[in-house]
Design a protein with these regions (language model features):
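Donor-nucleotide binding loops and adjacent catalytic segments primarily
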Residues: 42, 50, 182-274
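Short acidic-hydrophobic, aromatic-tinged amphipathic segments that line or gate anion-handling sites
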Residues: 63-67, 145, 164-165, 258-261, ...
């Protein structure tokens, strides 16, 4: 079985890492299976890309396209590669432009697509990610769902075949890669932080990172927290701040907010584990907060990870200053979530694909 995996953004590197491990494990057990990685270049700087490959022991990409966020350029670059390779399966992850570009190009060439993290819905049609998810699920042959809710979403859209509830590969990754306690403490000491006495905040979605009013409100709210806040600034957010003097002043006046460059995955896991609170607009970090036992406030009005809200680990706050502060001070009930499975989701995915292709 020959696989081409198409990835391009940080969350996809994490998910692909555990699936790559499962593929290597099957190959060592004698299965005829090989994988080649195509990196679209959607995340292109060192911390957002190469560092993750190094930390996660991901094989070097066979192809690196440097396409940025240009989906049509991605498709034009992916097409000749898939035509030459003719893999049995193309694997795509999540909801980025790389996801949809890979899925559409493979489908146009008659190559079956496996969508990992299928069936998620925020029910916000203005989000590009929502469009990418829906289109990719319509194209895919195999739809690997992290939760029962995702399965129900697909069934409600009339998609019932090729749907598998396998658990969450991000939980696999957290189980494998979370640093030991001593390493966690050494990481937070680099930032002069004390365990469970700081918040970690991230802002990266275009709807937030390119919205100066939203960023102003968020920075004002962060400045009013009664604890230090570590803010690894995503390149998109940093670019907006760089071109807006008001945002720069707000950050300078927020004396409790420590702005740093983006951190690697292992560092982020340690920071999440030892933080008192996570504040984010990231989908993945909402789950990681639960995996690491840390409450989360999400800077959005809706989420595709409804289980985290229903179980009392995650409050939806939007981007208004008062809404954020209110959410921070609301109690978190922190109930157990069964949905994310047992840390062996990647193995289940590869076994299903291998059995189907070799029938």
């Amino acid at each position: 079985m020959r696989i081409v995996t198409i990835i391009g953004a940080r969350p996809q590197f994490i998910k692909a890492a555990v699936v790559c491990r499962a593929i290597r494990q099957m190959a060592l057990q004698g299965a005829e299976i090989e994988e080649s990685i195509l990196h679209t270049g959607q995340h292109y700087d060192y911390t957002m890309s190469e560092l993750f490959f190094h930390q996660l022991d991901l094989p070097a990409p066979k192809w690196h396209l440097n396409c940025g966020n240009d989906m049509q350029r991605m498709k034009a670059s992916i097409q000749p590669i898939l035509e030459a390779e003719r893999p049995d399966i193309v694997i795509v992850y999540g909801d980025t432009y790389s996801t949809l570009a890979g899925a559409e190009t493979a489908a146009e060439l008659g190559i079956p697509v496996a969508h990992i993290e299928a069936g998620l819905r925020s029910f916000n049609p203005t989000m590009p990610e929502e469009h990418n998810r829906i289109k990719t699920d319509q194209i895919a042959t195999w739809r690997f769902c992290p939760t029962g809710t995702a399965v129900v979403n697909l069934h409600n859209e009339g998609i019932t075949e090729g749907v598998f509830h396998v658990g969450d590969v991000m939980y696999d990754a957290a189980c494998i890669f979370t640093p030991k306690e001593e390493k966690q403490l050494s990481i937070i000491r680099q930032y002069h932080l004390t365990a469970k006495e700081f918040a970690i905040a991230t802002i990266h979605r275009a709807a937030t990172a390119e919205n100066t009013e939203a960023l102003s409100n968020i920075f004002i709210a962060l400045s009013q927290l009664p604890m230090p806040v570590l803010l690894p600034l995503h390149p998109h957010t940093a670019k907006t701040v760089e071109h807006n003097s008001t945002l720069q002043v707000l950050l300078e006046q927020a004396t409790n907010v420590q702005v740093v460059k983006p951190v690697g995955y292992l560092e982020m896991l340690a920071l999440e584990r030892l933080a008192a609170l996570i504040i984010t607009d990231s989908g993945g970090m909402q789950k990681e907060a639960y995996f690491q036992g840390t409450p989360c406030v999400t800077l959005r009005e809706e989420t595709e990870w409804k289980e985290t809200v229903e179980a009392g680990w995650n409050h939806l706050a939007g981007t208004g200053s008062q809404g954020i502060l209110d959410a921070i001070h609301m109690p978190f009930s922190r109930q157990h979530i069964e949905e994310y499975s047992d840390g062996h989701s990647a193995e289940r995915i590869i076994h299903i694909l291998y059995e189907d292709v070799n029938r």
